[in-house]
């Protein structure tokens, strides 16, 4: 199927915003289509225990008639396949999306080469507890050395455990 999209930088002080800004202006069409989610990292409490029970398959990114991003994601786990649809509204800054009504505070594209990978940071909020992830999206079933290196760099600099 495909991989997910973008990432957020709200309460993280350890990574300067300037590192994510070099991407320039966003053309949402550069993110459209199927993506494999090849790696996920987080420092959320339950992540280390749950990571062996989940296998993220991918995401398909499309545009809505309102020009927002829509993601159809598929995740395999012990209970079978779960699918979800999420609409993300573009903020004024080029690579930031949100949908606070469903708990997505920010989604940022941290890095991409516009050809085969994107590193996505997501800040979610469930109740009053924030939950952050970094994900490696790839247009192919295996990631390039460049993509893996950037994913590892971002994950480690944020102190995340990877899956």
From Swiss-Prot:
Pfam families: Lipocalin (PF00061). GO terms for biological process: acrosome reaction; calcium ion homeostasis; cell maturation; cellular homeostasis; response to calcium ion. CDD domains: lipocalin_6. InterPro entries: Calycin, Lipocalin, Lipocalin_CS, Lipocln_cytosolic_FA-bd_dom. GO terms for molecular function: small molecule binding. Predominantly expressed in epididymis. Residues 1-20 form the signal peptide. Keywords: Fertilization, Secreted, Signal. The keyword Phosphoprotein does not apply. Transmembrane segments: none annotated. One of its GO terms (cellular component) is extracellular region. It is found in: Secreted. The keyword Signal applies. May play a role in male fertility. Belongs to the calycin superfamily. Lipocalin family. This is Epididymal-specific lipocalin-6.
